[in-house]
């Protein structure tokens, strides 16, 4: 009896993503030719938890014309910022039986630009990606080139963003598959970003494990070693690389259906809360994103229930 009930729950979880795709999940990420009104944004995108790419949302930003590598060098070249340094471009990712975070260095922007342009060398891959509102805290000189928030989104969501983040890196810098509890407005100023997306309803097919947290340390010889963070609790993370999934180890992932999209200069991606995303970029891409805290409403509760059942039934 208990085994039959457990199997019924497994079957329901496995069938749920297809039902969600038929009812609400888009097959491709749609484009809007202009920013929506606050009402339309909430009604058509936030409430149904659907992504979209918005054109002509940044045209009034001076940054769109100004921000080049040479402009950054002239404007903020001497400014030191937090830089993630990894041997392979993967910060905050599973490596073996560890969840490994990047080494962090305080480096002048000019040095990062020198490395990007091939004028200097630095061990590993550099990525300006500090996700704690690093734009206003570390690069306030650039704030006049953008907006401090997205007015129509702030009105729609009834709040200001929790964080405004600045991103700069080369094509080797990759963000591993994960999800956030934020309504994310991701704005590409120069270059392009490549997103692989999964809706929250794909959770039964996406594996999670618990990993010992660790950090890369950069040695004086320019090599990397992995050092455990013994004071931290284990971290739940996705071990799978969606670009080259090991379907022998994670066969259920073959049933997930990813959406792929490219966000180009001048475009804004609305990435809804709880959507899984994996991100790559063009060399020297410059971007800004706004994190608005999600509403912890019924959608969040339903996702937590699905997540708990997925783990309890052993699907992941």
Swiss-Prot record:
GO terms for biological process: proteolysis. It comes from the Eukaryota. SMART domains: JmjC. InterPro entries: Cupin_8, JmjC_dom, RmlC-like_jellyroll. Pfam families: Cupin_8. The keyword Methyltransferase does not apply. Bifunctional enzyme that acts both as an endopeptidase and 2-oxoglutarate-dependent monooxygenase. Endopeptidase that cleaves histones N-terminal tails at the carboxyl side of methylated arginine or lysine residues, to generate 'tailless nucleosomes', which may trigger transcription elongation. Preferentially recognizes and cleaves monomethylated and dimethylated arginine residues of histones H2, H3 and H4. After initial cleavage, continues to digest histones tails via its aminopeptidase activity. Additionally, may play a role in protein biosynthesis by modifying the translation machinery. This is Bifunctional peptidase and (3S)-lysyl hydroxylase Jmjd7. It comes from Mus musculus. The gene is Jmjd7.
């Amino acid at each position: 009896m208990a085994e039959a009930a457990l199997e019924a729950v497994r079957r329901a979880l496995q069938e749920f993503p297809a039902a969600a795709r038929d009812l609400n999940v888009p097959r491709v990420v749609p484009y809007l030719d202009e920013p929506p009104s606050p009402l339309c944004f909430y009604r058509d995108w936030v409430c149904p938890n659907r992504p979209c790419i918005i054109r002509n949302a940044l045209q009034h930003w001076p940054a769109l014309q100004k921000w080049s590598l040479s402009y950054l060098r002239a404007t903020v070249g001497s400014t030191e910022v937090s830089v993630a340094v990894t041997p392979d471009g993967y910060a905050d990712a599973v490596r073996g039986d560890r969840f490994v975070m990047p080494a962090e260095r305080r480096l002048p922007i000019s040095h990062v630009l020198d490395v990007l342009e091939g004028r200097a060398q630095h061990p590993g891959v550099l990525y300006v990606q500090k996700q704690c509102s690093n734009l206003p805290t570390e690069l306030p000189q650039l704030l006049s080139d953008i907006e401090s928030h997205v007015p129509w989104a702030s009105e729609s969501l009834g709040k200001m963003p929790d964080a405004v983040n600045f991103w700069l890196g080369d094509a080797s810098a990759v963000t591993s598959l994960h999800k956030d509890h934020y309504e994310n407005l991701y704005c590409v100023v120069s270059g392009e970003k490549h997103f692989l997306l999964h809706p929250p309803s794909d959770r039964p097919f996406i594996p999670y494990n618990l990993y010992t947290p660790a950090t890369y340390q950069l040695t004086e010889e320019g090599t990397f070693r992995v050092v455990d963070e013994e004071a931290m609790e284990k971290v739940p993370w996705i071990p799978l690389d969606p670009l080259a999934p090991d379907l022998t180890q994670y066969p259920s992932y073959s049933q997930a259906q990813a959406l792929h999209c490219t966000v180009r200069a001048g475009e804004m991606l609305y990435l809804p809360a709880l959507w899984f995303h994996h991100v790559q970029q063009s060399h020297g891409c410059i971007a800004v994103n706004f994190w608005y805290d999600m509403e912890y409403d019924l959608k969040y509760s339903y996702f937590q229930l699905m997540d708990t059942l997925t783990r309890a039934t052993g699907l992941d």
